[in-house]
Amino acid sequence: MPNNRQPRPAARDENPGSLLADPINLRILAELGRNPRIAMSELGRRVGLSAPAVTERAQRLERCGVIAGYRLELDPAALGYPVSAYVRVRPGPGQLRRIAELAASIPEVTECYRITGEDCFIMRVYAPAIDEFEAVLDKFLLYGQTTSSIVQSAAVRPRSLPLPAAPPPAR
């Protein structure tokens, strides 16, 4: 069963492109995308390999960086965080680094990205209530301007990226 360990750095002789050219590896990735907790024996059965062979392939995909990790998805509302928002931040002069540090220090900020455009950061914030969301925003207002958008519903839930097409079989 896949675990949450961090993948090892890519070995010099492993090329993500060559691994992705293999249709069996693409099938492994598709199955893991549907169910990251699948047992290696079941994964092997689905792609036509033994458990040790499919385990080795999955580990190679991890080592070369194609598989970046396995993640647990939690329901924020079930954990007491029904308020979800995206917040854009435009730092004041000289405050760029401080915004990134502040975002990293606030547990309710679950993602923060440096972006192009008028704002410099976009982040995902969860809170138990609007007043607590406002308290998070107030921390950023010390260092710049914020623009927030409360999430009403998810039109598309997080999902795996599309995989490259399998190459045609060699003749």
Please describe what each predicted stretch is.
Residues 1-171:
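A compositional/biophysical signature of low hydrophobicity enriched in polar/charged and small residues
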